[in-house]
């Protein structure tokens, strides 16, 4: 099970009932935070999300509405006597930016490990998460993120017995570990069937539409994508400032074959956003407006 909570849905500036951009993903006692805009701490408190289990922070880019909440969050983590290291992933220049933001939090009781992104696509495996960072098209260097929880095949007791594998080795093999025991090497494929469908969430904000985004989001259970503008005539502004309209996001969701789309990162000028959703659903039926604290528990398919 993967817990998803959209903490903030505002672009550019926070508004009443609309904090700046942030997304929380929780799995197996670990927490990923994607972006950390102003108000993220309040949004986390309101959603009942603990600061301590945050192991990984993914930053899309260095515009203030995506990172302005970071110094305060680091201070809160330090005041909570956190000692476990924090990994921060972000575009090239991340170390410099984090160092600058830490001016007000120079001494922390935990290590910060910065991973700078340089390539078009980069992949990481941490704490059970498979993270794909993919470059998008904004005014500055910017990345989207797909986070996947993979699922191994079913364990076959029959195959384990046929191969005379000691029962004490079944558990580590079922978890995907290779085991050496009494001079023999046992591998997971000896007892596991084909990999089963996992859970996938893709998050993309601050970009023009790209085929690269469609490819990264393909097959996602949930696609969270910016919809900066809802008014169709604002396509000119969207192109000028490298953002998207509701309809462009819906078109990408359709082409990517995702199960569900949440729109987010709304312009401060956007009001009565619900009025535009019928037209959006004409393009992609399973599209919804993101709202602060909107959450879902994504489950593995039963098979």
Swiss-Prot record:
Cofactor(s) the protein requires to work: Zn(2+)
UniProt-listed Enzyme Commission number(s): 3.1.26.11
Cofactor info, note text: Binds 2 Zn(2+) ions.
Catalytic activity: Endonucleolytic cleavage of RNA, removing extra 3' nucleotides from tRNA precursor, generating 3' termini of tRNAs. A 3'-hydroxy group is left at the tRNA terminus and a 5'-phosphoryl group is left at the trailer molecule
Record keywords, A-Z: Endonuclease, Hydrolase, Metal-binding, Nuclease, tRNA processing, Zinc
UniProt-annotated binding residues for Zn(2+) 1: 61, 63, 138, 206
Active site positions: 65
Protein family according to the UniProt entry: Belongs to the RNase Z family.
InterPro entries linked: Metallo-B-lactamas, RibonucZ/Hydroxyglut_hydro, RNase_Z/BN
Oligomer and partners: Homodimer.
Name of the featured protein: Ribonuclease Z
Gene3D superfamilies for this protein: Ribonuclease Z/Hydroxyacylglutathione hydrolase-like (3.60.15.10)
NCBIfam families: PRK00055.1-3, RNase_Z
Task of the protein: Zinc phosphodiesterase, which displays some tRNA 3'-processing endonuclease activity. Probably involved in tRNA maturation, by removing a 3'-trailer from precursor tRNA.
Gene symbol of the encoding locus: rnz
GO molecular function, a single term: 3'-tRNA processing endoribonuclease activity
Top enzyme class: hydrolase
Residues reported in the UniProt entry to bind Zn(2+) 2: 65-66, 206, 265
Matches recorded under Pfam families: Lactamase_B (PF00753), Lactamase_B_2 (PF12706)
